[in-house]
Each structure stands twice: as structure tokens, then as C-alpha cells.
Amino acid sequence: LPACICSGPSFVILTVGEQLLGSRSAGVCLFAAQVLAGWLTAALLCRVRGIPEPLPAPPAGAQTEPPPALDSILAQSAVTYLKLCGFVLYFRLLAAGCGLLLPEALAPFPAMLLEVCSGCDYAARTGLWASGLCCAALSVQGASVLLQVRTLCPPEVSLRPLLWGRLLHLPLSLALFYLGLPQDAVESFNTLYARVVP
């Protein structure tokens, strides 16, 4: 699970990199850092915790129920999709509220903890540390993503490895991001001015 939670390449490369930071190459470096940090995090967690025992197979007699009907599957899918969208909207509104109440320099931090898109949006406006803060926002993922994962996973799947994974992922992704950038790119990304939106 810790290696699977990552924002998609189109969001990271095109939206965060190209649109928010003004550089597609920054987006590629961000995405590469996120994927590599996810793999390293999963490898470290497997090394520390060991490979988990597989869940026991259900008894043969328990499979006598007929499979659910197609209409109930579609209805359940629609409800789940609405829950996922609801988490994004709810935490985006909370992040926007924090952005209005807090000074501009502090606005990215609660946004990062609440919702990844808001975190990247506020982080990109900081100028000096925009690329590093966007990397941190992508690594943390926010409460919205954690609740989306909780909604999609069955109750017997623990989120504890994912939470530990996020703690490991953050320093790894930042280190990989800055190690993977050429020095002149680091200097130019760290001196970006806040974007002006007409």
C-alpha cells in the first residue's frame, strides 16, 4: 500500500510542474522523486516489518451466497465515487478557509495536510521554496487522500503501514528531488516569483 499511493503523472508533470511551477522538467523530477521514494519506502517497511501473512481463505461453506446483482454493484460504485469527490471538495474548502485566515507564508502548511491539490497550489505561490514545498505536498498527500484510501480499502486492511510510509516518504522524496535536479535548475526553481493570475 505505501508504494501504491502516488499522484498521477499528468497531475504532477503537467499541472504541478508546467502550470504551477512553470517547468515541465520540474514536474518530471517531482514525479520521479515520488515514485522512487514510494518504492524505497515500501522496501524499507518490508525490511523492518517483514512480509505480512496472507489473509486466511474463507471456509468453503461461506461461498454459498449468490454474487450481488449488477444494479447493486453500480449503485455502490456511484456512492463510493461520490464519497471520494466529497472528500476532495470538503478538504479543498477547509484549505481555502485556512488560506484566507492565515498569513500567506503559512497557508501552504495546513493545505498540504488537508488536500494535495490545494497544498501544491499554495506551495507554488511561495516563490523561494515553491518546488520543495510542492514535493512535500505531493509526498504527504493530505487527509483527503488518506480518507479516500480508507473508503476504498476493506475494513480488515490496516492503514498503519501507509501512515508510517508517509513519514518515511517525505524526507526520501525531498532528498531524491533535490539530488535529481541539476544545480542550475535548483537555483532557478527556488527563485520563482509568485504567479500572477489575471
Predicted regions and their residues:
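Alpha-helical transmembrane segments
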Residues: 26-42
